[in-house]
């Protein structure tokens, strides 16, 4: 598999010109699957279908969309320029055109407390699968872009607790509706203790790889 993440939208002409597509598609044809990011508002037939044709039938195209959260008010406050209906339409278009859908879900976005964070992570997982997602990536929301630090000083943001991320991952996997992964980058921001962080990383990576929740349950039982 090949993942091309460009910290933006692959089909944004300001990010990746269409003139570069033939070379990119040619290189990607040696892979079974190509995963690219796309903003839900940029799901456009005149851009995506030509690239899909360049790839050919031997390489499966998977589009990764950021839902972030299915919480209507929080989604609006995140200023992504989408709502649930826009996301649903984009997801339906992707599945209708025989592409796979990967969805990014934030675990504990701003404006939610810990119990709300777990509830809405699970509800967002349900919503993503209802939209036809094959894969869901759970992203623990972490500071680092300035805006979140500002929200943190006002008490409107804090990173999720490790057990919230583990519980959300366990919920998604046990549904059996598709693959669910937890992002393990920068875990020390969730768990600064080196020994506990190493154990957390091992449990998450095992669950990611095996798509089983036994290791997560053991970790949650130990607290």
Language-model features: locations:
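Core AdoMet radical
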Residues: 1-16, 27-44, 60-87, 137
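Distinct, well-ordered alpha-helical segments
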Residues: 14-22, 44-55, 115
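Conserved C-terminal portion of the radical SAM core fold
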Residues: 85-147, 166-184
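Auxiliary Fe-S-binding modules of radical SAM enzymes
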Residues: 129, 141-223
């Amino acid at each position: 598999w090949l993942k091309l993440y460009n910290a933006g939208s692959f089909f944004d002409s300001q990010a990746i010109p269409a003139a570069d597509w033939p070379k990119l598609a040619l290189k990607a044809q040696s892979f079974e699957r190509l995963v690219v990011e796309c903003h839900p508002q940029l799901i456009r037939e005149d851009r995506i279908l030509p690239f899909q044709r360049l790839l050919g039938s031997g390489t499966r195209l998977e589009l990764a969309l950021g839902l972030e959260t299915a919480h209507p008010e929080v989604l609006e406050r995140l200023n992504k320029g989408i709502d649930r209906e826009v996301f649903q339409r984009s997801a339906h278009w992707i599945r209708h055109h025989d592409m796979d859908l990967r969805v990014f879900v934030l675990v504990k976005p701003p404006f939610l407390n810990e119990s709300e964070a777990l509830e809405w992570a699970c509800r967002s997982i349900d919503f993503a699968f209802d939209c036809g997602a094959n894969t869901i990536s759970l992203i623990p929301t972490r500071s680092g872009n300035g805006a979140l630090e500002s929200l943190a000083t006002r008490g409107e943001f804090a990173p999720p607790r490790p057990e919230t991320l583990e519980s959300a991952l366990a919920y998604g996997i046990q549904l059996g509706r598709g693959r669910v992964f937890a992002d393990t980058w920068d875990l020390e921001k969730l768990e600064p203790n080196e020994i506990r962080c190493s154990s957390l990383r091992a449990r998450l990576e095992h669950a990611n790889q095996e798509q089983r929740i036994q290791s997560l349950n053991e970790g949650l039982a130990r607290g």
